[in-house]
């Protein structure tokens, strides 16, 4: 999704990791993790996409994604396709290398300070699936609190649904819009200037509904915010931190 609709998010993921001295590899033939097909019930297509993913990324590097939904797809849902198959060993090796960005920064790189500034009132939107399925904890909040100038508003342990859900937003468009409006109205009520989302899909969903309903608020991903906040870095490269971007 980032590649097709938000290429700047993929570029910003690169900037964030390079700022921390991480050497990166970008498999140019990569396509998708297969989540959209999986959620739509097209499991054969999702399995073929998964095979391509495993063959292209391998298991030698960390694989860092700006999306907990995609990371969960690879970490957990691929098990339905590749358990006890010819790709079983390759998948198991890769499984432990897959991380959502904030999880990677906090729990692998152990980032405890961020050299960036961004003056704004922001509300963080963490998808339910990121917490329930991927088991993301407070890593996004930890990162936001490191950025000078950020004022966090809204519930500090807030996790919700943006109403996207892949085909859900098409099949149940009215309900999807109402869910997004609830989140947008909460942010406006709390005085937020920005909604910071952990999923690119939620940025697209919330932006679309905000524009259609004349709601004046900016929406961006956590990845984009981290990159936007950067000013200077004296990070030193470590050969232990080699990743592939997915």
Language model segments and positions:
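Iron-sulfur cluster-binding electron-transfer modules in prokaryotic oxidoreductases
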Residues: 1-246
């Amino acid at each position: 999704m980032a590649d097709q609709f938000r290429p700047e998010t993929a570029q910003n993921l690169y900037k964030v990791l390079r700022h921390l001295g991480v050497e990166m590899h970008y498999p140019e033939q990569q396509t998708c993790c297969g989540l959209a097909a999986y959620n739509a019930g097209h499991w054969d297509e999702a399995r073929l996409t998964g095979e391509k993913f495993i063959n292209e990324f391998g298991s030698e590097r960390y694989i860092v994604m700006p999306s907990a939904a995609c990371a969960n797809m690879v970490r957990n849902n691929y098990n339905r396709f590749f358990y006890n198959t010819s790709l079983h060993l390759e998948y198991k090796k890769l499984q432990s290398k897959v991380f959502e960005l904030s999880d990677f920064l906090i729990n692998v790189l152990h980032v405890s300070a961020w050299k960036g500034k961004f003056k704004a009132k922001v509300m963080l939107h963490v998808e339910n699936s990121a917490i329930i399925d991927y088991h993301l904890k407070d890593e996004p909040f930890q990162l936001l609190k490191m950025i000078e100038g950020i004022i966090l508003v809204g519930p500090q342990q807030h996790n919700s649904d943006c109403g996207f859900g892949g085909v859900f937003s098409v099949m149940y468009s009215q309900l999807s819009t109402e869910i997004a409006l609830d989140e947008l109205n909460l942010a406006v009520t709390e005085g937020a200037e920005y909604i910071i989302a952990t999923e690119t899909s939620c940025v697209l969903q919330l932006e679309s509904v905000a524009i259609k309903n004349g709601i004046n608020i900016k929406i961006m991903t956590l990845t984009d915010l981290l990159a936007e906040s950067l000013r200077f870095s004296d990070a030193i490269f470590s050969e232990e931190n080699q990743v592939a971007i997915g």
